[in-house]
Amino acid sequence: MVFKYLAIALSVTLQAAPPAHADTTLVAVAANFAGAADAISAAFHVDTGHIAQITTGSTGKLYAQITEGAPFEVLLAADTKTPEKLVAEGQAVAASRFTYAIGGLTLWSVDADLIGADAKVALLSDKVRFVAIANPDLAPYGVAAQEALTKLGLWDEVQPKIVLGQNIGQVFAMASAGAADAAFVATSALAGPDAPVSGSRLDVPQDLFTPLRQDAVLLNAGKDNAAAVAFLAFLKGDKAHDIIKSFGYDLAE
């Protein structure tokens, strides 16, 4: 009888344990998703035993690194075009591509009194000398900021105040440090456990910019790596979805 219960307990333990052989995968992540990616990576390791090593940057720079031979195995982009382009160029697995998050754009300042209900009043204020956005040539969130300013009829007036960050994470850092009086940041930067508790903000209406649908794709370098395949599968699951939503993103329907 003792042996029977011991066998059952051992069976349950083996079923619950991570795989005996854990692998590592190299994941390139758009800067806006850095915090969420770190949290997902930690949960992924607990669940599977695999390790996802996260490298962040602008989608444009990550694309350039991939095409130049960087050994990334998974890409979490800030747009849909870059994964699509990598598939078309034969550098990624077509069937693996999916939308993992939909981002938002927020005008934010560390000054609690600077930004009210009218973006025009804030951006044209004499108190605002510098407005930070991500470089539109490198970062989809920079494109979104430019689109929003153009649709609001403010691009020409605000352009002399604009300073560029190489990615949306750098833009948030500039605004946080006071190097920019206001900034168009990823809404996710103002959510999650490390979000600032002060400042003023105005969420940019979604109809002012092309939806920030963010696609993931398995790169050719990772198609034979169990950890890379498992990471993308985990990204589609409930645990990852809960983390993604906690950082202020929407999920694709």
What is the meaning of each model-derived region?
Residues 16, 20-22:
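Boundary at the C-terminal end of the N-terminal hydrophobic targeting segment
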Residues 4-16:
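Bacterial N-terminal signal peptides
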Residues 22-56, 60-70, 77-80, 84-89, ...:
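Exported/periplasmic ABC-transporter solute-binding proteins
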